[in-house]
Amino acid sequence: MFNTSEEVRIVTETIRQAARERIAPAAASVDATGELDGEVLSLLWDLGLMTLVFPPEFGGAEQSQGTLLCTAVEEIARHCASSSLMLIIQAVGSFPLLHGGSRELLERVLPRIVERRELAAYLVSEPGAGSDVGSIRTTAVRDGNEYVISGTKCFSTNGPVASYYTVLARTSENGRNGLSFFLVDGDAPGLKVGKIEKKLGQRGSKTSEMYLDEVRVPAGNLLGEENKGFLLAMKDFDMSRPAIGAQALGIAEGAFDQMLKHSRERKTFGQPLCEHQMIQQIIADSATKIEAARGLIYRAAALYDQGKRNTKLASMGKLFASDAAMQITTDAIQVFGGYGYMQDYPVERMFRDAKLTQIFEGANQIQRLVIAREILKEAA
């Protein structure tokens, strides 16, 4: 841990205990039913975790917001990735509002969000625009004191349950320099929930298509400057990618804990599994990857908290941790053997949950391009 402030230590221990005692018991049910446990969601709000990145006067942390977000996500993902995803999406979906909304807008909507415990959704991806954000076709046309937004968004986490949406739409035909963010209320006429997706993993969060059919929003709901939405999205990544890395880290740790326990208890050829050299190699490699991932993630989070550029480390942390999580969960199933393939044991769920961390907020192939670009900038 790179930030060892008393606040971080206290929060870490509080979350760790809550995750172990109150979130872990519901994890299998959350996965099986595709429904997040209501008591777990209430717990996340009660602990102040859903507003960690908000201004302090609206329930946010006084300092170290990036580190605390990563800490909370990691500890919860160790037991239930779906529950940890709620923290990530709340932070990601709120970022354009928090960093682009006018003071008047923030003072009007943030108290409502906190009081009513409203969920956010982040509407960026489209059927023809995933990693290529500049290809977004959803439009926002100025009409007097309003903007009229029309288009289709996909893979919208929290789409069916959110109360407010931050929507990236095209305000000019200037590629990525023609995009703008808007705040859209969940009850806005013309905003409709489309197909609810059936997912491989992290099933406790609802993901859907979203349709915007001439949705009218006040001009004051523009977040940041017009045509500067792409830059706001890139800044959002500097916060979200370490958090996703932390989720991958938590999943990897959870699988490692299960693997280690099983390898000590299960006997084969007259001795515990952990006494076999091939199993020891898996244990050693997994533990090393976990420690290396933690270093990258919390360095990136510390830079974010200091207001310093962390783009390279944020991508490195997400890339390394998510690849490590995929490998460690795969190896955990291998150590469990046939039992690991069965839903009676949590490692198969962790394996499915890990895959998303290699994809969302920029696929790992994109992370490699970002890392190389940043290195070449530094070398120029």
UniProtKB/Swiss-Prot annotation:
InterPro entries, per this entry?
Acyl-CoA_DH_CS, Acyl-CoA_Oxase/DH_mid-dom, Acyl-CoA_Oxase/DH_mid-dom_sf, AcylCo_DH-like_C, AcylCo_DH/oxidase_C, AcylCoA_DH/ox_N, AcylCoA_DH/ox_N_sf, AcylCoA_DH/oxidase_NM_dom_sf
What reaction gets catalysed by this protein? cyclohexane-1-carbonyl-CoA + oxidized [electron-transfer flavoprotein] + H(+) = cyclohex-1-ene-1-carbonyl-CoA + reduced [electron-transfer flavoprotein]
Which keywords fit this entry according to its UniProt record? FAD, Flavoprotein, Oxidoreductase
EC number(s) in its UniProt entry?
A: 1.3.8.11
GO molecular function per UniProt = acyl-CoA dehydrogenase activity; flavin adenine dinucleotide binding
Cofactors (names)? FAD
PANTHER family membership: ACYL-COA DEHYDROGENASE, ISOVALERYL-COA DEHYDROGENASE, MITOCHONDRIAL-RELATED
Role played: Acyl-CoA dehydrogenase involved in the anaerobic degradation of cyclohexane carboxylic acid (CHC). Catalyzes the 1,2-dehydrogenation of cyclohexane-1-carbonyl-CoA (CHCoA) to cyclohex-1-ene-1-carbonyl-CoA (CHeneCoA). An alternative substrate, cyclohex-3-ene-1-carboxyl-CoA can be converted to the corresponding cyclohexadiene-1-carboxyl-CoA isomers (30% rate compared to CHC).
The family line of this record is: Belongs to the acyl-CoA dehydrogenase family.
Quaternary structure per UniProt?
Homotetramer.
The protein here is known as: Cyclohexane-1-carbonyl-CoA dehydrogenase
- Provenance organism: Geobacter metallireducens (strain ATCC 53774 / DSM 7210 / GS-15)
